[in-house]
Amino acid sequence: MLKTIILGVIILIGAVIAAFILVGRERSWELIAGLPDRGPHDFDANRRSPTPNDALACSPGLCAKPDFEIAPVEEAPALAIERLSLRLIASDPLARRVDNRKDPAKARFVTYSPLMRFPDVIHLQARPLPDGRTGLMAYARAQLGTGDGGKNRERLEALFKTR
């Protein structure tokens, strides 16, 4: 009886793994948890994940309690977002832009962890500052799990080269 139960569990696990491989890792997570892109992040509302699986970076004064600050830039908002978008795509082959590009001062990307393809979303936004420079805001969040091991913060730090 015990052997039959163990064999049944092994077969079930094998079937789940085979389905995961056949359907594809990214699509499997999508079927389990829904689309990773849940729309734009509202930086003004400053809502964060209730679990430690996100990271927030902003130029001084643009958001409350960022994980780290990023310096304002001299470029116009649209150019700053375009530069950051190109840098992100160049550094992360799994990242793809998912926003409709109607607002050139905003961008949204979905990317995936290399091995298991866990989905993360990255939101970028730029705003003109009173001094003529452009302030930057970035929010990255894992769609699945309650922790990301600091990966989203690392991703933003690399994007803004703060290390």
Name these PLM-found stretches:
Residues 2-7, 17-163:
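Ser/Thr-rich, low-complexity intrinsically disordered terminal regions
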Residues 13-14:
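Acidic, proline/glycine-enriched N-terminal capping motif
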